[in-house]
Amino acid sequence: MPTTRQCSFCGHEIPPGTGLMYVRNDGTILWFCSSKCRKSMLKYHRDPKKYKWTTRYMKVR
């Protein structure tokens, strides 16, 4: 039975058969639910704690 994965950027669950697996040169495996999450992490180096649409969002105050 396929397992559900968790997005490395936003933290949402990824259903089996969807999403993208990205493998870095050091062997680290990153799972992304959308191109929005992939670009935010890899291209723009954004911090997921600063965006309300992620489950990792933390209010500063």
From Swiss-Prot:
Zinc finger (C4-type): 7-37
Protein's name in the database: Large ribosomal subunit protein eL24
SMART domains xrefs: TRASH
The entry's keywords: Metal-binding, Ribonucleoprotein, Ribosomal protein, RNA-binding, rRNA-binding, Zinc, Zinc-finger
Organism of provenance: Saccharolobus solfataricus (strain ATCC 35092 / DSM 1617 / JCM 11322 / P2) (Sulfolobus solfataricus)
Pfam families found in the cross-reference section: Ribosomal_L24e
GO biological process: translation
Function: Binds to the 23S rRNA.
Keyword DNA-binding: no
Positions contributing to Zn(2+) binding: C7, C10, C33, C37
Protein's UniProt keywords contain Zinc-finger: yes
Annotated cofactor note: Binds 1 zinc ion per subunit.
Gene name tied to this protein: rpl24e
MF GO annotations: rRNA binding; structural constituent of ribosome; zinc ion binding
